[in-house]
Amino acid sequence: MRKLRTVKPDGRYLIYYGFGERADLPAISPLGETPPQAAEGVPAPQMRWNPVLRQWGVVASHRQERTFLPAEERCPFCPTRDPQRPTEIPAPDFDIVAFENRFPSFVSGLSFPAETEDELYRAQPARGVCEVVVYTPDHHASVASLSVQQVRNLVEVWADRSQELGALEFVRYVFIFENRGEAVGVTLHHPHGQIYAFPYVPPAVERELASARAHEERTGRCLFCHILEREVAGGARLVLEGRHTLAMVPFYARWPYEVHVFPRRHVTSLPELSEEERMDLARALKVLAGKYDNLFGFPFPYVMVVHQRPTDGADHGYYHLHFEFYPPHRTADRLKYLAGVELGAGTFLLDATPEEKARELREAPPHSV
């Protein structure tokens, strides 16, 4: 893998990743030496503290202006074919591209608003980095339609971005995710994901860290390794098993077709995965995406997130890297909505058993690649 870093006319950086025939791209300086700069003219987002829930939220009003469901010929993530109508990606072709989001929730190169001293209503600059990762120049592709090698290349890019963004002194957590389908709020259909380099550890991950730490202190074991051992022994909730990777519908699933994907070996982050583990993970992600699409015979919407250890310098050896998929469909023509009990009480209601949904996914093709 090689990288070529360029700067867009508005000041945002863009990184081309080359593999195979394009692997002759020149190497570039890591982001730790060249901190990313946000685009000029972008209003500075602000972090605001919720004293009731004791967690941060972000106010980024300029995101109201982001692109909303453009026609395919106006897609900003397709390669530039006509110099008179440039897209976000100037090159006419590419493998994978990562660049600063035009409408970021966190930024790193602006004059930030002053931090408030109000004990109740705390606020401070939303300092961080928001990137877009475009998986392929093919507007109609998906993780399921990409080759295993292409997904493997994507895993490599995720690991690289995790390492470089995590090395920035103001970043405490590198959060990788993909939103797929209008049912989960997608406004651009070109296959892509995003990365948020947070200045704090997000609440969902904080809770997982606390549980994993407590379990290790109590039992001497990794909580997630313990869960995987039980799932393999039982088998009813497994969706697929690879040499180095497992996928399951959790016993504690909140979404009907929720799937968690784990490396079998205890690793805490993407950069720690071996070459064989990265390839096996790519196979698992491609197979799972194919199962989702074949389940009801249409492109299956989902939210995919990567949970890995923080980059805050603390010892998080008790944690376990994994992917989580949250599809909103509960049947072919019905969606699960978050309503009163989920939003107001924080308790998820599941209209099906995880065992039943795992069986449906096991039986859906493909079974291997």
Where are these regions (language model features)?
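HIT superfamily nucleotide-processing domains
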Residues: 1-369
